[in-house]
Amino acid sequence: MSAASTTSTPAAAAVAPQQPESLYRVVQTLGEGAFGEVLLIVNTKNPEVAAAMKKINIANKSKDFIDNIRKEYLLQKRVSAVGHDNVIRMIGMRNDPQFYYLFLEYADGGELFDKIEPDCGMSPVFAQFYFKQLICGLKFIHDNDVVHRDIKPENLLLTGTHVLKISDFGMATLYRNKGEERLLDLSCGTIPYAAPELCAGKKYRGPPVDVWSSGIVLIAMLTGELPWDRASDASQSYMGWISNTSLDERPWKKIDVRALCMLRKIVTDKTDKRATIEQIQADPWYQHNFGQVETPNGRPLKRARNNDENITCTQQAECSAKRRHLETPNEKSTLAERQNASFSQPTKTEDLLLTQHIDMSQTNSNLLQRMVCRMTRFCVVTDIRSTYQKVARASEHAGFGVRETDDYRLLVTWREVSMMVSLYTMGDIPDKPRVMVDFRRSRGDGIQFKKMFMDVRNRMHEWICTDGNNWLANLGYVPRNPQIVNGGGVNVEHSASSINVDV
């Protein structure tokens, strides 16, 4: 990659001055897509200064494609100018003849879908905790005249202290200019989360489509499943919800009455009756005191009723530079994760690109912690060669496509979902063959990916052991699984502080 230029763009004043790429170092790839990749980078003079770099290939691309990258940058820069704890911050942009580079805040806690257990979801206290942050972030975005149009768990990132951040503005647009709202007409988004008016190709108001998507995210958090494939007349489950005839079926029977009443106001096909952000924040379920959330970090933080929280932020971005048309769940990046380490966040691109070398042990550290947070992994008592064969066989028996990529790595696919399976020998357990099997989503819906993982895991249950967690713990890593504790709170292992969600 050559040194980036600062050729004239609509955002020329905000683009960083020319800097050689050697001033920062790529630690690892966070995600890959059809048009580029997302990289975790650090300042080579100060490796504690980190950011996510979205590297987008523009070679032989149309003017519209490049204009949409600039639009994504400008919209996210617009909301970053003031900044909000629940929205990923844009740091800057550079470009050369082959690539555009977007530099974004780095979040070290994974994607929200990592926390959603298939067919189970998560506890109501944590669902409310994350939902409140999502609503606060959406309110801020809408107040700045921007609509996101692709709200889903894969685009909601977390910090190590469970601060939720809205990311990926690749489908965002301005819905209001100088106080005058306009109707939108582009059909875009991810089908299971998209509002019916958007699926139908009608003109639509901006904010209500984000409200609808937030409701689908809440359903996924509470139940671990999506209510339908598409909000259209062709969907029996969708029509059952609209006609109020399917409440004794899944997923609705898993949801308590108070939450269901709120969802009725959010997930309604009547846009003029769909709840506003303010109405959601006043709803009894939103305001209900479920208890407190324990986090693995420093000082206690308070949640205030209907107010923006003042929580220290940290991100990663996703490879979706193009303005995508309506599609099935698409490829998104996976976060590198670090526990017990808080990266500094550069305030502008020059602060990041000041930069010697990061120790390769740092890369290994990120790789291991990435496994810990995802929880889509297990340890087996067979050697690596036989493990490889067993994983391939289990995947094939589940009806998945299996393709060898390189040594001890498999690409497993089913419909629109694909996952990469990597095997690691646990060499520090003497005289015992132990292999860590790690699954990473590379494309498609996160909840369906987890179901695929569970299917393969269940087919290999007779070889699975618990040594993997002990191995990671001995290396200084501990899986961070939220748990319900006394009084209805949520506990995270080795918690030293809490976030009070009293309202």
Curated annotation (Swiss-Prot):
Gene Ontology molecular function terms on file: ATP binding; histone H3T11 kinase activity; protein serine kinase activity
Record's protein name: Serine/threonine-protein kinase chk-1
Catalytic activity: L-seryl-[protein] + ATP = O-phospho-L-seryl-[protein] + ADP + H(+); L-threonyl-[protein] + ATP = O-phospho-L-threonyl-[protein] + ADP + H(+)
Chief subcellular location: cytoplasm
CC per GO annotation: nucleus; perinuclear region of cytoplasm
Binding site for ATP: L30, G31, E32, G33, A34, F35, G36, E37, V38, K54
Gene: chk-1
Tissue specificity statement from the Swiss-Prot or TrEMBL entry: Expressed in the germline.
Phylogenetic placement of the source organism: Eukaryota, Metazoa, Ecdysozoa, Nematoda, Chromadorea
Modification Phosphoserine occurs at: S344
Organism encoding this protein: Caenorhabditis elegans
